[in-house]
Curated annotation (Swiss-Prot):
UniProt xrefs under InterPro entries: eL8/uL1-like (IPR050257), Ribosomal_eL30-like_sf (IPR029064), Ribosomal_eL8-like_CS (IPR004037), Ribosomal_eL8/eL30/eS12/Gad45 (IPR004038), Ribosomal_eL8/Nhp2 (IPR018492), Ribosomal_eL8_arc (IPR022481)
Gene behind this protein: rpl7ae
Name used for this protein in its record: Large ribosomal subunit protein eL8
Record flagged with keyword Magnesium: no
Protein species of origin: Nanoarchaeum equitans (strain Kin4-M)
Major location category of this protein: cytoplasm
C-alpha cells in the first residue's frame, strides 16, 4: 500500500469509494455538482456544498491540501476517493478532477445521507 498524501486524514474503504463515484454520477444527472478545486472551494465557502469529494492521487498535493481544514471549519462533510481520473469520469468531464462538491444530490439524497453517516463513523474511529 502506497503511503497516503498528508491531506488524507482517514482511510476510505473501496466499497464506500465506489458509492461516492455513484453518488457523483447520479447527482450530476439529477441534481447539481461542482467540479474542480476552485469550484469546490467556492461552494464550501458559500455554504452550498453538502459533501466534498477529494481525490487521493492529486499531484502536487498542495492543490487540495486546504480542503479538509476548510470543510472542518465550515462544517461540511468530506470524503476521499482513490482516483482523480475516476472522479473526473463520474463528474462527466474528460479530464481528471482533483475534487468535486455535491450541491444538490437530486435523486441520490438517500445515498448522500448514507455516505455522510459512513464518513462520520470512519472519522470517529
Amino acid at each position: 500500500m502506497a503511503e497516503k498524501p498528508p491531506y488524507v486524514k482517514f482511510e476510505v474503504p473501496e466499497e464506500l469509494a465506489n458509492k461516492v463515484y455513484e453518488l457523483v454520477r447520479k447527482a450530476r444527472e439529477t441534481g447539481k455538482i461542482r467540479k474542480g478545486t476552485n469550484e469546490t472551494t467556492k461552494a464550501v465557502e458559500r455554504g452550498q456544498a453538502k459533501l466534498v469529494i477529494i481525490a487521493e492521487n492529486v499531484n502536487p498535493p498542495e492543490i487540495v491540501m486546504h480542503l479538509p481544514a476548510l470543510c472542518e471549519e465550515k462544517g461540511v462533510p468530506y470524503v476521499y476517493v482513490p482516483s482523480k481520473e475516476e472522479l473526473g469520469k463520474a463528474a462527466g468531464i474528460n479530464v481528471s478532477a482533483a475534487s468535486a462538491a455535491i450541491i444538490d444530490a437530486g435523486e441520490a439524497k438517500d445515498l448522500l445521507e448514507e455516505i455522510i453517516r459512513s464518513v462520520q463513523e470512519l472519522k470517529a474511529k
